[in-house]
C-alpha cells in the first residue's frame, strides 16, 4: 500500500521513464524553470493522500493533518496487535522515528530516546510490538541494506535506513510546516530523501524490483539502490 506519486496526481513533468533508464534508452537533461524549493517542501508536508489533492494549499495541508490525527483511533479494533496499545506512546515512538528519518539509527538508539522522552523504562519486546504495529498500519517502511557481493570480505553495514510510507506523517508528528522546512535545510534534506524513496518505491513495484541502501566499512555509501529481479541495479545519491 502506498500513497499517490506526483505522476499519479499529474504534478510531475513525466519527463523520465524508470524503465527506459534501466534499458539505457533515455538520457534525461532537464532545467527546472518553474518549480521552487517551497513547492518541494509543500509536497513533502501534504503527502500523497487522494483527498488532499485540492487547489487550496492551506486546505490541502489541513486535510493531511486531519487524516494523520486519526491514525491511532482503533479503540474498537479486533486486531490483537492493536489492542491495549496506547495512542500517545505510538505518537512518541513516531516522533523519535521521524527525528531519525533517512538515517541508519539503531533500534536500541530509538528505544533509548523513547525511554528518555518518557522518563521511564520500556521493555524491548513491548517496543518491538509497537514497531510491528506501525509496519502493519503502513506508517513506517524501512529500507534494508544491499550487499552486491555475498562472498566479499568487505564489511557491509547491515542496519536499515529509517523511512515512512509517506513523509507527510513524519512532518505531522514533528509539527512542522513547509515554511519550517525552508528554515531548516538539514531536516528538509532528510525528509526530501524520504519523499524520493516513497516515489521510487511505488514506481519500482511496476518493474518487480526492490529498493535498498548501501554503505560499507570503508565509507562508501549510496542513499538508494534500485535493484531489479534480473540483476540490473541503479545507484542513486539524493
Protein language model annotation of sequence segments:
Residues 232-238:
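Active-site ExK catalytic segment of metal-dependent nucleases
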Residues 7, 50-51, 234:
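Glycine-centered loop/turn positions within well-structured domains
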Residues 1-2, 214, 236:
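Hydrophobic residues at beta-strand termini and immediately following loops
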Residues 9, 47, 223:
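Residue-level signal for inorganic ion chemistry
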Residues 2-23:
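Conserved small helical "lid"/interfacial subdomain of P-loop NTPases
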Residues 23-70:
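Amphipathic alpha-helical "lid/sensor" segments that cap RecA-like P-loop NTPase cores
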Residues 3, 167, 238:
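Active-site donor-binding loop signature of nucleotide-sugar glycosyltransferases
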Residues 53-232:
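Accessory nucleic acid-recognition modules appended to NTPase machines
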